[in-house]
């Protein structure tokens, strides 16, 4: 249990992001009992750096009481997060039914005693993360009876104090191609860029782009989205291209209603939404441009719902069409369109981390000379309690910033 003394007007600090250290970065992954690979823990999603396996183990070491285990798959050429788009079918993930095991005494990742910490059944997505109890353990292992496909990355984060630095990037083929980091092996992801600017933070980020998908598809599959990624703290949303395809406004009202439904569902799960402005096409190649009414609707939704403002993909790609492919719509890997998307996302969400970093520094200074005139913020595991100088509890918040009753 930790105590911080804060002035009363700083109570909003209860909503700050809590760092969840990446424990697996650079660790060796042991594959199928007799192989090892640094591909799976290098932070890169470059498509050729994968391992086909149904048994992956990582030595994390002792310390954390709880960890967030995430994985990214390639699925034999498929980059789409799920087969949820009515307009076009996608390659389904092979990693459907599997278990996550933990061990305290393994020496190789395959010997020793193992406990089943989490079981996943009927999984439909290529990227996902789950919270796992890790008290007294030192090894993590993913085990599937069937072929699991191609692992791009396996990451393990320390969430002993909460898991609210966790992100899901919901999007279209623009995100499927851009956020999947296909530009080159040197492309820096949004998570890498945030870590460079704010070294205390190593965000857990799941990529969720689906080609051909529109907001109606997402609303129709909201139960599946919430089952797979309802446990993260932020949904970073890139949508609108397929809803506004062709440049007309015939689908505008449906788009707005669908986005509001998605926002409401996220909020009901304690998820904060960051909404990007829809990407501009290169109209000389695509033959159309997004109607400005879509942008106005997105701006209104951000204001009305109190959302975080995401990147302005429209303004950037309107000014820099050279980052788009020959179809005039998708980020061009050869010219760095994907890298630009990662940079724009990092720039958009950096203020969230800047506010947190500033608050923590300020509060540490004040805590060192605390006086009875200051309120107390009590951090106990994943919850935060604010108390007045008289000891009265003002409010309790969980690690996601939600009121804890």
Language-model segments: what does each one mean?
Residues 361-405:
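C-terminal outer-membrane/trafficking sorting elements
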